[in-house]
């Protein structure tokens, strides 16, 4: 499979999605392809970590339903302020997996109102094309052209024993082909193809580590160079940035530099 070796700025020029265009330009201007996964359970720690890591990332990935003291005013509004301060985009890792009408309601409503603040979210392909259509409708109804939204499909996972591989992954790719503008890419471990058909999917990869090989709970880690050389555009790192004994600012810079150098190498700029 051919790995995309174009620069982020070149891809921004030709991409069908306004969200992808914005993300590529942001990555190029900040010189980072790092996404920080902030899985903590209090608003205070959540915002403090994001403020420290913000300068080094292109994306902050949230699991907003983990936060015990969540409120829109105290959690989301400060998050949006930090996104403006540090110039990053927001990815809510919701993993929608229901019929179109249900995911639309989950996306736009409830206490979280995800569509109102998350630039990007994601979904499983298990329920078919309806999940894409439902989320797209939700985005259209709650946002403007000035705040476009994008969707990632879960093609592959980094956990031991994952069922997302082989035929399942290929069928998820077929679902992604149903909407060139709203579906911007995949959560995957490698390039998912599509270039020959005019698609330019962004590949975001979790389970990336510079030090650890696993966590004892099924997570497997691969190196930055390994994932970028096989097609990853954005590396997703969580505990490697702020786990026990780790300084988020030191690790943020370390992972940012490792990811960017791997990208420069892949695109022949280094």
UniProtKB/Swiss-Prot annotation:
Any one biological process term the GO annotation gives: 'de novo' UMP biosynthetic process
Binding site for substrate: 39, 61-63, 93-102, 221, 239
Pathway of action: Pyrimidine metabolism; UMP biosynthesis via de novo pathway; UMP from orotate: step 2/2
The EC number(s) this enzyme carries: 4.1.1.23
GO MF terms held by the record: orotidine-5'-phosphate decarboxylase activity
Record GO cellular component, one term: cytosol
Gene3D superfamilies the UniProt entry points to: Aldolase class I
InterPro entries per the UniProt record, alphabetical: Aldolase_TIM, OMPdecase, OMPdecase_AS, OMPdeCOase_dom, RibuloseP-bd_barrel
Pfam families for the chain: OMPdecase
Annotated keywords: Decarboxylase, Lyase, Pyrimidine biosynthesis
Reaction it catalyzes: orotidine 5'-phosphate + H(+) = UMP + CO2
Record: active site: 95
Family: Belongs to the OMP decarboxylase family.
PANTHER family per record: OROTIDINE 5'-PHOSPHATE DECARBOXYLASE
Protein name (record): Orotidine 5'-phosphate decarboxylase
